[in-house]
Amino acid sequence: MISASRAAVSRFVGTAASRGPTAARHQDGWNGLSHEAFRIVSRRDYASEAIKGAVVGIDLGTTNSCVAVMEGKQAKVLENAEGARTTPSVVAFTADGERLVGMPAKRQAVTNPNNTFYATKRLIGRRYDDPEVQKDIKNVPFKIVRASNGDAWVEAHGKLYSPSQIGAFVLMKMKETAENYLGHTAKNAVITVPAYFNDSQRQATKDAGQISGLNVLRVINEPTAAALAYGLDKSEDKIIAVYDLGGGTFDISILEIQKGVFEVKSTNGDTFLGGEDFDQALLRHIVKEFKRETGVDLTKDNMALQRVREAAEKAKCELSSSVQTDINLPYLTMDASGPKHLNMKLTRAQFEGIVTDLIRRTIAPCQKAMQDAEVSKSDIGEVILVGGMTRMPKVQQTVQDLFGRAPSKAVNPDEAVAIGAAIQGGVLAGDVTDVLLLDVTPLSLGIETLGGVFTKLINRNTTIPTKKSQVFSTAADGQTQVEIKVCQGEREMAGDNKLLGQFTLIGIPPAPRGVPQIEVTFDIDANGIVHVSAKDKGTGREQQIVIQSSGGLSKDDIENMVKNAEKYAEEDRRKKERVEAVNMAEGIIHDTETKMEEFKDQLPADECNKLKEEISKMRELLARKDSETGENIRQAASSLQQASLKLFEMAYKKMASEREGSGSSGTGEQKDNQKEEKQ
């Protein structure tokens, strides 16, 4: 155990068993930066070095993802290969090991529910034992398993994948979308996260970017990004609230906009509340009604449940614009009496009754955010709605009742976050110069102290980047090391908060208790990610810190996942090359056979037979296309094309000579006729 550096020890922290630290406040407050200093650091942080190439803004969403780039002073949302501006955050693995991302993955979910991953953002940076993960296990058809580091991972066909990997596959799709538009490699990115994400979740998101091959310049909060999208072209000063209810998370942020400075005053939220919960609530209602009417329980039938899940999502969306919808699922299941069909009418009022508790859960965080920002609802000049769930009329009414004003629909709820990320990318690249973003840390940071109490060092809603230091000392004679448990959260007891890591300070020179002065510095960067360092004030030497992470991906894990992602990218490239070669070959076969039929009278029979043999060989090659390379198929197709061109060239020459022959004989007959007429 270590004690405070002051003569009178104010309190002991940690337990004797853990040899924990003891801390004391300095007379002038924490040995760190003042609030004004935070602002200076924040401003300086945006004076980035020159960044080469475009910076893409990516909204890595729970349900859908979106990518945008800056074009001049405007952000442009990009369409994917399917022509859509948003991409489902769905990844699937087929029986033959093929990986599908986006809409192709979503389309086959009904027939492959156990190996189709959706809403995995809810697992990112979480431990397997987290209550939210245990709840999710009961609701999804795919397997969520405990990884060797205790984190929650997913399993498909016996292979384990971290949620960061699944996120990386989606990011690779977004990267590809950007590259197709830009015409060159996209390397730099700004990725958004829910404002209420903790350090582990932010780090795991950054890892996902690294695995996908992106250089993540900044991780920014989704509501803040939406505020940038809203306020970029606004000149008036005002306080705004951003109410962000997306597919998996809920955030509320209060911001003050003044002459291009976007300062977050407070943020709050719930990282396990969103559209997925609305879908799940409606699914449970449908399954319950179906059992009441037919006596059949669908809960053990994953394929039927996936159909109901998709129908529930569709009904939810329809009820935002209609007061009633029909849910029709023919041949949903069957029992001894035959097939069972689902036919149900659902009104908007019924749906609102089913999800009313979920909507109510957004109220307390909003009230807390206003309280932390020290503003009343009359001070808020605009309420911005972000996230697909804010299209629901009941949600809009709740927001209006809460803030006392009709919410603004000035931004597209699906695209605003990606647009804001692209604007932030423009700021970092130096293309956008009149914008400054001052964000905050959403959760308090501190250490475990005596009796398991959580002692805060950096309070929530502190402007970031920020740095605060505290001096510790030993609590026993001759003590050479001490363990510090760093936590993040708002609960009074450390055990109820998120354990970020256990930091063991070693190599402390043996001395009487209270003599060594070890300055431990807690630093939160502009991404909201926590760093910890320690220094012996007596010698000026940096002390060695052994970090025992409470989970997350190691450097080796990330390197392996990068290699796997590159392997998948190479496989995708080879597959695309093979598909293009097969299409080319089939086109050549079709054209050759058509021309052979058209010119059969002009072609030598033996040459035709040779060409037919070539076509047969080509068809045999295509029959085993999955084991052939695209290059082999392309070469064989080119050979067939050359052979057919030579043959048809012969046919054309023969036809031309026949035409000339018939033309000259016809001219002779005309001359004879003319002679006869003259006579």
Curated annotation (Swiss-Prot):
Ranges for region Nucleotide-binding domain (NBD): 63-431
Presequence range in chain numbering: 1-46
Sequence segments annotated as region (Interdomain linker): 432-441
Signal peptide boundaries: none
Basic and acidic residues composition-biased segments: 669-679
Keywords, in A-Z order: Acetylation, ATP-binding, Chaperone, Cytoplasm, Hydrolase, Methylation, Mitochondrion, Nucleotide-binding, Nucleus, Phosphoprotein, Transit peptide
Main subcellular localisation: mitochondrion
Omega-N-methylarginine PTM sites in chain numbering: R513
HAMAP family named among the record's database cross-references: DnaK
Protein family membership: Belongs to the heat shock protein 70 family.
Protein name (database record): Stress-70 protein, mitochondrial
Gene: HSPA9
